[in-house]
Structure formats: structure tokens, C-alpha cells
Amino acid sequence: MTARILIVQCRMDHPEINARTFRFACRTVELYRALRRAGGAAWEIAPQFLDAGTSIGANLEEATGGQSKRDFIAKVCIALKQAREARFWLRLIRVSGLPPSKAVAADLQEVNEIVAILITIVRRAKDSLENR
């Protein structure tokens, strides 16, 4: 089985992941702008959250062009790490009461679902690699 076939299988299992991570990146940019406007600690957190939140989808796009199964898995793992980092920043924003802390609940739910999907993709890809 080639890497391209593996990618198609993952997409067939979760066809919405690229669209969801793109929408999440768009919401990340919106929250980044709100955090920067708020100033203070929010100003400092904003760039780190922006980097993590926008790189999830970018790394999935790179995974799509992976040259091997191992390359595909590595890139999806990077996307997973970035999703976990974005989740950390969202949790911090929420519990610290940084503006707009009330707006992050939906984003936190979405990133939790993205993490779960990416874990499934990585597990299936690794299983496929081991079973060939």
C-alpha cells in the first residue's frame, strides 16, 4: 500500500478534517486579533496561540503530500502536537479570564475533537505501516 492510498483512506474515514482545521485556523486568527486588542498578558499569549492554531491545518496539508507513510505519520504527529498546544492556550485563556474568555468554549470543544480525530489517524496509519 502506498502513502497516497493511506492518505485517501484517512480522508475517507474523516473527510472533514482539512475543512475543520482550516475553519479552526480562521477562528484562531479572529481570537488572535481580539487578544492583541486586549493588551497585557493576552498580548503576549496571542502570537503563541496563533502559531499553534494555524499550523494544525498547514501540517495536515504537508502530510497530504508526504513522500512515504512514515513522512505522512510524522507530519500528522506534528499537527497533533500543535493541536494540543492550541488547546493549552485556549484553556489558559479561559481560566485566567483573559478577554475574550467567554468566546473560547466552542474553540476548545473543536480543538478537543480535532485532537481525537488526529489521534485516530495516527493510530490507523501506524497500524497500517506495521501490518504491511
Where are these regions (language model features)?
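Short, C-terminally biased terminal segments at protein or domain edges
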Residues: M1-R132
